[in-house]
Every structure is written in C-alpha cells, then in structure tokens.
Amino acid sequence: MVVIEGIKYACERCIRGHRVSSCTHTQQPLIRIKPKGRPATQCLHCREARKNKALHVKCKCGSSSSKHAATCPCYSGGGCICTNKHPQVLPPNSTTTGANGCIVINKAVLDEGSQQQAQQAQQQSQSQQAQQQQQQPQPQASPILQQPQMPTPVHTTNVTTPPVATPTHSHRALSTTPSLSPQPQSPHSPESALKSVNFLGRTNSSSSLSSLHSGRNKNRIEKVRPSHNSLSAASQLANSPSSPFYAVTPPAWVDSPTLVPTGALDASYLQILNDDLSSPLLDSDVFSSLDMEPVAHSNNNHGGIPTGGSRALASTDINFDRFESTSPSSILSSWNLWGGVGGSDAPEMSVAANPSASASASSIQTPPSSNATPEWVQGQQQPCSVSPADVMLPFKRDDQESVFLTEPLYL
C-alpha cells in the first residue's frame, strides 16, 4: 500500500483480495483505495446538497423548474446523467478522476521524487569534493629534487668493449639467463650424464621416470623411439676411460634388472637400441644386428663377469608389431631361439665387456660364476634365458607404431 498526499493506493489484485494493507506491488498499476462505508455520490451538486455519502441513483434536481438547473452539471435535456455512465461531465474541480472515482499511477510517478532527491544529493557531494580539492594546498617539491644535479665526470679509456648482440627470440633470452643453482655441475658428473642420456638411450629422463612411477600396473606399455644423436653421444661416453657408465649399477627406480646390462654400457648394447624399428624382419634376421656367439668363457673375464650370456633378453628389445602370426609356436619356430636337444649350438646374446671395467667389478652385483651351470639350464632343454612363458602373444595397434612392453608378461 502506497500513501500519496493522504490518499492510499494499491494494486487491483490486492484490492479485490482485500489485501490492501500488505500490498507491495509497486511495479503494477496502482488504484486508489476507497474509504470505508458507502461511496460518495459522483454528482458534486447532489453531494453538497444532501451532505451525506449515499449512492447517487437518481437526481431530482434536473428539472427545468429547479433553481439549480443552471448550475447542476448532471442536467442535460431534463434528465440526470450519472457520472458512472458519463465521466466526461465531471467538473474540473472534482476531487476524483476517472470513471469509477479511482486514479491509476505508475512506478515512474512514485520514483520521481526519489530520483530527484538522489540527483540533488549527488550534486551536493560533487560540489563538496570540488571545494575540498581546491582548499587542499599543493605539495611542494622536495629540496633534494630542487638541487641541481652535478654532472658526472666522464673517464675516457682506450679499452673498447665488443657490442653485445641482443637475442631476437624470447626463448633464446631465457636460455642465456644464468642458472640459479649454487654449485654448477660438471659435464662429466653422473647427475648430468643421467639427465642427458638415460639407460634406455632416450634424451628425456623425466619422461622415463614419470612413465615408470605414474602407473602402478606392471603390464605397462611404452613407446620407445631412441634417437641417433643420443645413442652416438652415449657410445662416446661409454668408450672413454673417464666415463661414468662403467660398471653402472641399476638405480632403485628400475623394476627389472634386465633393462640394464651388468657390464659396461658399451656400443654393443647401444646397437640393440639403435636397430631400425620400422623395417620388417625375416625369419632369419631377428638377431642379425646382435653379436651372436655361443656361450664361452673369455680370458678377459675378471671378477666373475661373464662375457657371453651376461645380459638376458629384455622385453623391450622385441617388437611384437613386426609379426603377423598369432600362434606362439610359429613365433618360436621363426625366431629359432630354442636350438637342438643338446643345446650346444644355441645362439646366445652377449654384450662385449670392456676390459677397463674390471677395476670396479668388485662393486657390481654379478650373477653366479660362469663356470657353474646356471639353474635355468639344469634339467631343461632350452639353453636360452627366455622361456616360452615369457613370450607374449603379438598384438597390433591402429596407429601402426612400435609398441614395447617394459616388463615381461606371463601367460
């Protein structure tokens, strides 16, 4: 309910529902609330004459003989015209407007006064802020700034510095910034060597660490793409006397000891990784790039390090995408891994041990001596270090990329 100049207004729905006291619908058209009791007559002359609030039903003053005929607004042709039927005959000084004695107001009429007050308050605040800014004194300049600056003496020297070329790209500028590490690492330190080339021949060591630590499932699949530059750099490091790769012990994060040879990381092991993974293999070319020689004891075998059979067949060296057959027997027969019954002519993969690695051979956890018969040879006809249970059925991928198993799967 809205009160304007002592007159109450409410919406039509609240008036019909007798809820005028709780009406807050200011966004809808508002209608004047009539006072309690019978409404006053719409005829001003009759209302003033009778001095009551009775409903004007019929006017008897409209006769021509009446003394009020000239001044009665409802007189027209000898009859009474009620304001409910003809609202246009209302006098201009009437207190009510409209056919039913009600007025209709909008929200704009109600907000007009509040908007004017808000504008006046805003103007006053702006004027006060302007006066305060004018009254505030301007800050004086400090005496230090007012003092004349003394010219700095220029010392001429005969030494000329070469111009520094500014980098054109942002990534070059980032690469030229000095390192924040307090102790720089030497290029031959084990930490830098492990960061540059890891045991699998890849240049990004963080990717191998994340791939080994991220998945807890042991049947992990990883795509191995060794680059030629990283392999050549690793082979040069392995052949040098001061190489940190002599007698490398597998770190703690390596799950299987077959991923790293027990001897030195020499060119023979790198040649295995550098094999062309995209060309298809024939039946007799499976181990063409490897050093195929029978199990023998060399004279350079110091510290119990065997030269032949020192490295078991890692599952990362077999590309299952090269074979189209899905039978394990056909794969074993085509690989020719199991040899004859006696096992004397069975080929064996070996990595040539570096003679200079014998100095640190005492710190290497070596397998049993080659003079004794290994446990996997006793009572079996397969002299190879890979058993038929270690061979997984080959599978194909839609992307036709080389897929390797980082750990052997057992059937």
From Swiss-Prot:
User: In Gene Ontology terms, what is one molecular function of this protein?
Assistant: DNA-binding transcription factor activity, RNA polymerase II-specific
Name of this protein: Copper resistance protein CRF1
Name the Pfam families for this protein.
Copper-fist
Q: Which SMART domains match?
A: Copper-fist, Cu_FIST
Query: Where found in the cell?
Result: Nucleus
Question: Disordered: where is this region?
Answer: 115-241, 348-389
Q: So which domain of life are we looking at? A: Eukaryota
Q: Which UniProt keywords apply?
A: Copper, DNA-binding, Metal-binding, Nucleus, Transcription, Transcription regulation, Zinc
Q: Which residues bind DNA?
A: 1-40
Explain the purpose of this protein.
Transcriptional regulator involved in resistance to high copper concentration.
Composition bias of kind Low complexity appears in: 115-190, 205-214, 227-241, 350-370
What InterPro entries does this protein's entry cite? Copper_Homeo_Regul, Cu_fist_DNA-bd_dom, Cu_fist_DNA-bd_dom_sf
**GO CC annotations?**
nucleus
Its primary localisation, in coarse terms, equals: nucleus
Q: Where does Zn(2+) bind?
A: 11, 14, 23, 25
Biological process terms in GO annotation: intracellular copper ion homeostasis; intracellular iron ion homeostasis; positive regulation of transcription by RNA polymerase II
